[in-house]
Amino acid sequence: MTKQYMTHRCLIAPPEMADDFFANTVIYLARHDEEGAQGIIINRPAGIQIKELLNDLDIDADNVNPHEVLQGGPLRPEAGFVLHTGQPTWHSSIAVGENVCITTSKDILDAIAHNEGVGRYQIALGYASWGKNQLEDEIARGDWLICDADMDLIFNLPYDDRWDAAYKKIGVDRTWLASEIGHA
């Protein structure tokens, strides 16, 4: 049987997620292969505006569209990741899905600051990562649900709506889920 990888899909935290950091999150998987997985939380604002972040990096951002930076995950919170539509045209761009790329180089930040060449995007600080077979084990335990990624979920919906929207994509009303089965 061939192993199914989940790059360009989303993980959905169950309502009773044991790990507080990942409670109520939706994680876009930018990489999943035999060595492990990496993803970006797409529904948790970091409390900083893109203009502020760009100014901190000495990038003139007077014309940037208002947008919140995301808290992408617990690892390397000082590192920036740009999840965006389009082709992998920047220095460190990698295509991860149809019309979805992730870029870590400064040249894309300059383009964002000047509203040039970047369609829809999310900037995240930090990322989540799983070692070999770790994510598969967590999914088997019921630690995560999985849904297909789409442009609305990744880029358009308000952050507060993305968790519920991910549940709707798999046809589940999360209020019906329970962490434990009762006994009569």
Swiss-Prot record:
UniProt GO cellular component terms: cytosol
SUPFAM superfamilies for the chain: VC0467-like
Domain of life: Bacteria
Database matches in InterPro entries: AlgH-like
Alphabetized HAMAP family for the sequence: UPF0301 (MF_00758)
The family this protein is said to belong to: Belongs to the UPF0301 (AlgH) family.
NCBIfam families: PRK00228.1-1 (NF001266)
PANTHER family linked: UNCHARACTERIZED PROTEIN YQGE, UPF0301 PROTEIN YQGE
Name listed for the protein in its UniProt record: UPF0301 protein ABAYE3454
